[in-house]
């Protein structure tokens, strides 16, 4: 249970003997913001699920884990999602690269109207970016955290960035 933190919203998925087994549903009161937008964890989770269903499942791929942050070092700032997919041979497939680009756009289309307006009309939010990480990257983050008895938040970006295998941006702007 070392993966669960205070503020995680859990759902009992199964029982092993009489002990409950949990799945993380989301995190309470976690949000991303660049301008006046506010994207909560549950909204982002639904957007990623919609993108997975529309684009990844037809290729027998699925999202195993993800983490996101707002990159405000670029102008305009934008959302970055580190994503680990189920093990498939996608690294050299250019058509799969276009699939991930479409995932970016579908996620943006699924976010709230404030985000879409700031992205499409005002241009104060840049295109969403997905960075695919190598298989097992999120397990490495958790192993690193437990070995140091520290929160993964302190070093997650550094570890994930070192394990990026490809980078993808939204090919268009969401409708608003």
Task: Tell me the role of every PLM-derived stretch.
Residues 1-176:
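AMP-binding adenylation
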């Amino acid at each position: 249970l070392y993966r669960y933190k205070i503020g995680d919203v859990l759902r009992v998925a199964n029982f092993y003997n009489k002990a409950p087994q949990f799945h993380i549903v989301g995190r309470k009161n976690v949000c991303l913001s660049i301008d006046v937008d506010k994207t909560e964890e549950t909204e982002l989770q639904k957007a990623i699920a919609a993108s997975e269903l529309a684009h990844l499942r037809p290729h027998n791929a699925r999202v195993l884990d993800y983490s996101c942050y707002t990159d405000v070092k670029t102008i305009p700032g934008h959302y970055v999602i580190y994503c680990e997919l189920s093990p498939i041979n996608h690294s050299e497939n250019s058509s799969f690269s276009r699939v991930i680009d479409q995932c970016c756009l579908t996620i943006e289309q699924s976010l709230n109207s404030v985000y879409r307006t700031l992205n499409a009309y005002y241009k104060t939010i840049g295109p969403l970016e997905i960075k695919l990480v190598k298989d097992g990257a999120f397990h490495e983050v958790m192993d690193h955290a437990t070995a140091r008895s520290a929160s993964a938040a302190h070093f997650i970006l550094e570890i994930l960035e070192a394990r990026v295998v490809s980078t993808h941006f939204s090919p268009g702007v969401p409708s608003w």
